[in-house]
Design a protein with these regions (language model features):
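Active-site-proximal segments of metal-dependent phosphoesterases and phosphodiesterases across multiple
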Residues: 50-93, 111-114, 141, 146
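Short, solvent-exposed cationic patches
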Residues: 45, 51-53, 191-197
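Flexible loop residues that form catalytic
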Residues: 60-62, 96, 166, 176
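Short beta-strand segments
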Residues: 29-31, 56-60, 92-94, 100, ...
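Extended active-site neighborhood of metal-dependent phosphoesterases/phosphodiesterases
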Residues: 1-51, 78, 100-152, 157-160, ...
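Short catalytic/ligand-binding loop motif for oxyanion handling, primarily in non-cytosolic enzymes
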Residues: 64-67, 99-102, 131, 169, ...
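Acidic, histidine-bearing metal-coordination/catalytic regions of metal-dependent phosphoesterases
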Residues: 154, 162-164, 169-197
Length: 197
Protein backbone atom coordinates (compact mmCIF):
# COMPACT_ATOMS: atom_id res chain seq x y z
CA UNK A 1 0.00 0.00 0.00
CA UNK A 2 1.03 3.59 -0.49
CA UNK A 3 2.11 5.72 2.45
CA UNK A 4 2.16 9.53 2.54
CA UNK A 5 5.22 11.30 1.15
CA UNK A 6 6.56 14.38 2.94
CA UNK A 7 8.21 16.31 0.10
CA UNK A 8 10.04 18.61 2.53
CA UNK A 9 12.12 15.64 3.71
CA UNK A 10 14.94 13.82 1.87
CA UNK A 11 13.79 11.08 -0.49
CA UNK A 12 15.35 8.39 1.74
CA UNK A 13 12.68 9.28 4.36
CA UNK A 14 9.72 9.20 1.98
CA UNK A 15 6.94 6.85 3.10
CA UNK A 16 8.76 6.28 6.42
CA UNK A 17 8.23 9.72 7.98
CA UNK A 18 4.76 11.20 7.66
CA UNK A 19 1.73 12.60 9.44
CA UNK A 20 -1.86 11.45 9.19
CA UNK A 21 -4.76 13.50 10.53
CA UNK A 22 -7.87 11.45 11.20
CA UNK A 23 -10.85 13.09 12.84
CA UNK A 24 -9.51 14.52 16.14
CA UNK A 25 -6.20 12.61 16.04
CA UNK A 26 -2.82 13.57 14.61
CA UNK A 27 -0.59 10.50 14.15
CA UNK A 28 3.07 11.30 13.49
CA UNK A 29 5.38 8.53 12.28
CA UNK A 30 9.16 8.91 12.46
CA UNK A 31 11.90 6.65 11.07
CA UNK A 32 14.17 5.90 14.03
CA UNK A 33 16.61 3.93 11.87
CA UNK A 34 18.23 6.80 9.95
CA UNK A 35 18.62 10.57 9.54
CA UNK A 36 17.43 11.35 13.05
CA UNK A 37 18.62 14.96 13.13
CA UNK A 38 16.72 15.74 9.92
CA UNK A 39 13.47 14.56 11.47
CA UNK A 40 13.63 16.67 14.63
CA UNK A 41 12.54 19.97 12.96
CA UNK A 42 9.82 18.03 11.14
CA UNK A 43 8.53 16.64 14.44
CA UNK A 44 8.43 20.08 16.02
CA UNK A 45 6.63 21.59 13.02
CA UNK A 46 3.98 18.85 13.05
CA UNK A 47 3.38 19.27 16.77
CA UNK A 48 3.41 23.07 16.70
CA UNK A 49 0.90 23.22 13.83
CA UNK A 50 -1.37 20.48 15.15
CA UNK A 51 -5.01 21.42 15.66
CA UNK A 52 -5.88 17.88 16.74
CA UNK A 53 -7.29 17.13 20.17
CA UNK A 54 -5.03 14.07 20.44
CA UNK A 55 -1.40 13.77 19.29
CA UNK A 56 0.25 10.35 18.97
CA UNK A 57 3.83 9.56 17.92
CA UNK A 58 5.04 6.24 16.62
CA UNK A 59 8.55 5.10 15.74
CA UNK A 60 10.32 1.76 15.82
CA UNK A 61 12.91 2.33 18.56
CA UNK A 62 11.79 2.92 22.14
CA UNK A 63 12.22 6.29 23.78
CA UNK A 64 12.42 4.38 27.09
CA UNK A 65 13.72 0.90 26.29
CA UNK A 66 12.82 -1.86 28.74
CA UNK A 67 15.33 -4.32 27.24
CA UNK A 68 18.84 -4.83 28.57
CA UNK A 69 21.58 -3.23 26.49
CA UNK A 70 19.18 -1.34 24.21
CA UNK A 71 18.99 2.39 24.64
CA UNK A 72 17.81 5.13 22.25
CA UNK A 73 19.43 8.13 23.89
CA UNK A 74 18.95 10.38 20.85
CA UNK A 75 15.17 10.24 21.22
CA UNK A 76 15.27 11.06 24.92
CA UNK A 77 17.66 13.97 24.43
CA UNK A 78 16.16 15.44 21.24
CA UNK A 79 12.57 14.24 20.77
CA UNK A 80 11.32 13.89 24.35
CA UNK A 81 11.70 17.64 25.10
CA UNK A 82 9.39 18.30 22.13
CA UNK A 83 6.94 15.65 23.29
CA UNK A 84 6.88 17.36 26.70
CA UNK A 85 6.65 20.88 25.26
CA UNK A 86 3.68 20.04 23.03
CA UNK A 87 2.00 17.73 25.54
CA UNK A 88 1.94 14.64 23.27
CA UNK A 89 -0.57 12.12 24.55
CA UNK A 90 0.77 8.71 23.52
CA UNK A 91 4.05 7.32 22.13
CA UNK A 92 4.05 3.84 20.56
CA UNK A 93 7.33 1.95 20.04
CA UNK A 94 8.65 -1.55 19.32
CA UNK A 95 12.15 -2.88 18.61
CA UNK A 96 12.96 -4.17 22.09
CA UNK A 97 11.08 -7.49 22.10
CA UNK A 98 9.63 -6.81 25.55
CA UNK A 99 6.61 -4.94 26.89
CA UNK A 100 6.55 -1.79 28.98
CA UNK A 101 4.05 0.95 29.63
CA UNK A 102 5.01 4.02 31.59
CA UNK A 103 4.32 7.71 31.75
CA UNK A 104 5.89 11.07 32.34
CA UNK A 105 4.07 13.02 35.05
CA UNK A 106 3.37 16.71 34.63
CA UNK A 107 5.95 19.00 36.19
CA UNK A 108 5.28 19.01 39.91
CA UNK A 109 3.23 21.91 41.21
CA UNK A 110 1.34 22.41 44.44
CA UNK A 111 -1.99 22.27 42.58
CA UNK A 112 -1.18 19.12 40.60
CA UNK A 113 -2.94 15.85 41.26
CA UNK A 114 -0.92 12.65 41.60
CA UNK A 115 -2.51 11.21 38.47
CA UNK A 116 -1.78 14.17 36.14
CA UNK A 117 0.50 13.20 33.26
CA UNK A 118 2.18 14.57 30.17
CA UNK A 119 2.73 11.48 28.00
CA UNK A 120 2.10 7.71 28.08
CA UNK A 121 4.89 5.61 26.52
CA UNK A 122 4.35 2.05 25.26
CA UNK A 123 6.95 -0.43 24.00
CA UNK A 124 5.49 -3.67 22.73
CA UNK A 125 6.26 -6.89 20.91
CA UNK A 126 4.16 -9.08 18.63
CA UNK A 127 6.74 -11.50 17.23
CA UNK A 128 8.32 -14.66 18.65
CA UNK A 129 11.72 -13.13 19.55
CA UNK A 130 11.70 -12.07 23.22
CA UNK A 131 14.19 -10.28 25.49
CA UNK A 132 14.33 -9.74 29.24
CA UNK A 133 13.26 -6.53 30.95
CA UNK A 134 16.14 -4.65 32.57
CA UNK A 135 14.67 -3.29 35.80
CA UNK A 136 17.83 -1.29 36.58
CA UNK A 137 17.64 0.44 33.22
CA UNK A 138 13.95 1.20 33.76
CA UNK A 139 14.80 2.71 37.16
CA UNK A 140 17.55 4.84 35.58
CA UNK A 141 14.96 6.47 33.30
CA UNK A 142 13.43 8.13 36.35
CA UNK A 143 16.15 10.79 35.89
CA UNK A 144 14.36 11.65 32.62
CA UNK A 145 11.03 11.89 34.41
CA UNK A 146 9.79 8.45 33.34
CA UNK A 147 7.67 6.32 35.66
CA UNK A 148 7.32 2.64 34.64
CA UNK A 149 3.81 1.30 35.25
CA UNK A 150 3.82 -2.27 33.91
CA UNK A 151 6.25 -4.60 32.12
CA UNK A 152 6.14 -8.09 30.63
CA UNK A 153 8.49 -10.69 29.16
CA UNK A 154 7.96 -13.74 26.97
CA UNK A 155 4.54 -12.53 25.82
CA UNK A 156 3.22 -11.37 22.45
CA UNK A 157 0.70 -8.52 22.31
CA UNK A 158 -1.73 -6.63 20.15
CA UNK A 159 -3.42 -3.38 21.07
CA UNK A 160 -6.73 -1.63 20.69
CA UNK A 161 -6.89 2.15 21.04
CA UNK A 162 -10.19 3.97 21.16
CA UNK A 163 -10.90 7.67 21.38
CA UNK A 164 -14.24 9.00 22.54
CA UNK A 165 -14.50 12.73 23.16
CA UNK A 166 -12.06 13.54 26.00
CA UNK A 167 -11.02 9.93 26.71
CA UNK A 168 -8.33 7.83 25.02
CA UNK A 169 -8.35 4.17 26.06
CA UNK A 170 -5.35 1.94 25.35
CA UNK A 171 -5.72 -1.82 25.91
CA UNK A 172 -3.00 -4.46 25.42
CA UNK A 173 -4.11 -8.03 24.79
CA UNK A 174 -1.99 -11.16 24.72
CA UNK A 175 -1.86 -13.10 21.46
CA UNK A 176 -4.65 -15.37 22.77
CA UNK A 177 -6.92 -12.40 23.43
CA UNK A 178 -6.58 -11.98 27.19
CA UNK A 179 -6.46 -8.40 28.45
CA UNK A 180 -3.09 -7.69 30.05
CA UNK A 181 -2.93 -3.93 30.39
CA UNK A 182 -5.24 -0.93 30.21
CA UNK A 183 -4.54 2.79 30.42
CA UNK A 184 -7.20 5.46 30.18
CA UNK A 185 -6.21 9.07 29.52
CA UNK A 186 -8.85 11.66 30.36
CA UNK A 187 -8.03 15.08 28.93
CA UNK A 188 -9.32 18.57 29.67
CA UNK A 189 -9.08 20.23 26.26
CA UNK A 190 -9.28 23.75 27.72
CA UNK A 191 -6.31 23.38 30.07
CA UNK A 192 -4.47 20.52 28.34
CA UNK A 193 -4.27 18.67 31.66
CA UNK A 194 -4.52 14.89 31.50
CA UNK A 195 -5.23 12.25 34.09
CA UNK A 196 -4.17 8.62 33.86
CA UNK A 197 -6.83 6.22 35.10
Amino acid sequence: FTLPVENTLPEKLHETVYTVDYQDIRMITLNSNTSLEEQTPYLEKQLKESKAKWNILTCHHSVFSPAKGRDFEFARKNWKPLLDKYNVDLVLNGHDHTYARGHVPMTTTSSQGDDEITTVYVTSVSGPKQYEVDKDQMKAYEADGYTPDLTAEQTQFFHVITVENNTLTYVAYTAVGEEYDRAVIVKDFETGKKQLK
